[in-house]
């Protein structure tokens, strides 16, 4: 059996290949000892690691794994997934939305990291808890899916009420900027969480398309564990990218790019 592992700050992503089949699974990083014990009880042909906690795993297992830089591993894995899913693009920006977000430019041969922001899954969970007292990520994102941002976020259409705006009316003028205009309203947890995810999605997209413009490409690829069970984040990112005139790509199993790429480096 061949195993690639991306041991991140929040999640451990695992890719297994055996008998020409591929399997994906995740574990919380808090369960890293469980992963170590599992590896020590498996017959493994190839083991390759990446991510911030790769060294922790390597120090406690009986095997001799190879360790790769996570940026290179993610780029290689993404290249494989793009090809398998029929996306033939030569150069693009990709945003890896994990606990935070890292941005990379791929020129058809090599990747280079071109930026990063602190908005990502960590902000969704942390700010989400402060707004709702919910700690479970799946419960939080499920509730956010039912939220309405219009009572909380100030949109361009709210400013230009009776006039045609010079830019699309659905663009956000100020995140959470509509709150003081609706103090007589009850702000539900669903609405607050939807707006929090909106902030994350719009910041990531704004950064991604700014870099895409700088590197002269229309293609922006989004991967990362923050999209797990988070259809709202995906919709915000894809819609905002299109609204700004760029072409978004959401990659199935993109969160496993690092683990898959490590396996093939």
Curated annotation (Swiss-Prot):
Enzyme class: transferase
InterPro entries: ATPase_NBD, Type_II_PanK, Type_II_PanK_bac
GO biological process: coenzyme A biosynthetic process
Residues annotated as binding ATP: 6-13, 99, 121-125, 137, 225
Active-site residues (renumbered): 70
GO cellular component: cytosol
Keywords associated with the record: ATP-binding, Coenzyme A biosynthesis, Cytoplasm, Kinase, Nucleotide-binding, Transferase
Main subcellular localisation: cytoplasm
Pfam families: Fumble
Pathway participation: Cofactor biosynthesis; coenzyme A biosynthesis; CoA from (R)-pantothenate: step 1/5
Catalysed transformations (reactions): (R)-pantothenate + ATP = (R)-4'-phosphopantothenate + ADP + H(+)
Entry's EC annotation: 2.7.1.33
Subunit structure: Homodimer.
Family: Belongs to the type II pantothenate kinase family.
Protein name (database record): Type II pantothenate kinase
């Amino acid at each position: 059996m061949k195993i690639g592992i991306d041991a991140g700050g929040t999640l451990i992503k695992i890719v297994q290949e055996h008998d020409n089949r591929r399997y994906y699974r995740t574990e919380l990083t808090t369960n890293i000892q469980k992963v170590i014990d599992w590896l020590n009880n498996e017959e493994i042909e190839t083991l390759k690691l990446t991510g911030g906690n790769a060294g922790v795993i390597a120090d406690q297992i009986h095997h001799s794994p190879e360790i790769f830089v996570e940026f290179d591993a993610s780029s290689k894995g993404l290249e494989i997934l793009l090809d398998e899913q029929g996306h033939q693009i030569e150069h693009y920006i990709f945003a890896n939305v994990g606990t935070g977000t890292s941005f990379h430019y791929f020129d058809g041969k090599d990747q280079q990291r071109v930026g990063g922001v602190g908005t990502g899954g960590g902000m969704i969970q942390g700010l989400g808890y402060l707004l709702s007292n919910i700690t479970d990520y799946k419960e939080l994102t499920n509730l956010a899916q039912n939220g309405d941002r219009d009572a909380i976020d100030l949109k361009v259409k709210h400013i230009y009420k009776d006039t045609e705006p010079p830019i699309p009316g659905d663009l956000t003028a100020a995140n959470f900027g509509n709150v003081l205009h609706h103090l007589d309203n009850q702000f539900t947890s669903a609405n607050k969480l939807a707006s929090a995810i909106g902030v994350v999605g719009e910041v990531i997209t704004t950064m991604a398309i700014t870099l895409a413009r700088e590197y002269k490409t229309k293609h922006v690829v989004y991967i990362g564990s923050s999209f797990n069970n988070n259809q709202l984040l995906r919709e915000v990112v894809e819609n905002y990218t299109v609204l700004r005139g760029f072409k978004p790509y959401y990659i199935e199993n993109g969160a496993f790019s690092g683990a898959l790429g490590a396996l093939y480096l």
